[in-house]
Swiss-Prot record:
InterPro entries per UniProt: C14orf28-like (IPR040029)
Name of this protein: Dopamine receptor-interacting protein 1
Function: Could be a regulator of the dopamine receptor signaling pathway.
Assembly: Interacts with DRD1.
Gene for this chain: DORIP1
UniProt record, GO biological process: cAMP-mediated signaling; G protein-coupled dopamine receptor signaling pathway; gene expression; memory; neurogenesis; NMDA selective glutamate receptor signaling pathway
Length: 310
């Protein structure tokens, strides 16, 4: 039996433009997990208990991207195991390979999310878990210390009360430039966050110059990074760079997550073997080959993978 990833690659290879969609639903929105009571259960009524998942699009797109990234890069599962644990990575890949979509969502919810990050309630014989919210809260912030960075700064004024400072961040949030300059705005924003620089010290009454070191990854360059783009306007995103330099490492564009404002719904786009695909778990046909970017959707995040060192 072929794995899900092998089936997707085969469908791309055998595509002759007549049908640009994958043959079956992949990671559909929501999910129902049925628990059967054991034989020793005496007073369990009913014998079947359901776990119902709602509004799972806040993790679905990223789970799909994670699956593609781990399959496209043979060393990444081992690297990610250092952050997530080998048991989680192996279980995640097995569940996706075998089309166990509801179970893989429960794996993420129970293994990586805090209970206060989602709503749950018991209704009749069902436990309902509702993931309505922001995908960066439900996924990106739960990537352990994978993308943790640190930047040190020193003020030239010896009397500055905060002469030495450290800024540590667990996620990568880049903000649009306040003044719109010429050039690639995303790359400029990334450089603003990562590159060394000298600025006036903001400490009240200081007047010194503050020198910022290059921002570095706390645990080495991660296999992939997620750039939070939810504060950017569409007009600022006319050009998306296909590669970025982050802390002396080159990263290549692998995918993105997208937001439908009218439906308050997330989807994802990613590439496999040079072919771009759009995944939307809410649709009946939810995985299609792209011949142009999806329309009327806002960019929520950009996902880059670390380039292979040659």
């Amino acid at each position: 039996m072929k794995t899900l990833f092998e089936e997707i690659k085969a469908s791309i290879k055998n595509n002759y433009n007549q049908d640009r969609s994958f043959c079956r639903p992949v990671l559909p929105w929501g999910g129902v997990f049925t628990i059967k009571a054991g034989r020793k259960a005496v007073s369990c009524t009913p014998l079947y208990v359901e776990i119902r998942l709602k509004n799972t699009c806040t993790i679905d797109g990223f789970l799909m991207l994670l699956y593609v990234i781990l399959n496209e890069n043979e060393n990444f599962p081992r690297e990610l195991s250092l952050h997530f644990g080998r048991e989680f990575v192996d279980c995640f890949l097995y569940l996706m390979d075998t089309y166990s979509f509801t179970t893989v969502k429960l794996l993420w919810i129970w293994d990586k999310m805090e209970k206060q990050q989602y709503k749950s309630e018991v209704h009749k014989a069902s436990l309902i878990i509702d993931l309505f919210g922001n995908e960066h809260d439900n996924f990106t912030k739960n990537l352990e210390n994978l993308m943790s960075t640190i930047q040190e700064s020193y003020c030239s004024n010896w009397r500055c009360p905060t002469r030495v400072q450290e800024d540590q961040q667990r996620t990568i949030n880049i903000n649009p430039p306040q003044e719109i300059p010429h050039g690639n705005l995303i790359r400029l924003a990334v450089n603003e966050l990562f590159c060394s620089k000298i600025e006036l010290c903001e400490e009240h009454g200081c007047g010194g110059l503050r020198e910022f070191s290059q921002r570095i990854f706390c645990h080495g360059a991660p296999p992939f990074v997620v750039l939070n783009m939810q504060h950017w306007k569409s007009e600022d995103l006319a050009y998306v760079p296909y590669y970025l330099d982050l802390s002396d490492h080159k990263y290549l564009l692998e995918g993105a997550t997208l937001f439908n404002k009218e439906e308050h719904h997330y989807s994802a786009a990613f590439q496999i073997g040079g072919h771009w695909m759009h995944y939307d778990g809410l649709r009946n046909v939810n995985l299609i080959l792209l011949n142009k970017p999806p329309e009327f959707l806002l960019l929520s995040s950009l996902v880059y993978i670390r380039a292979t060192e040659k």
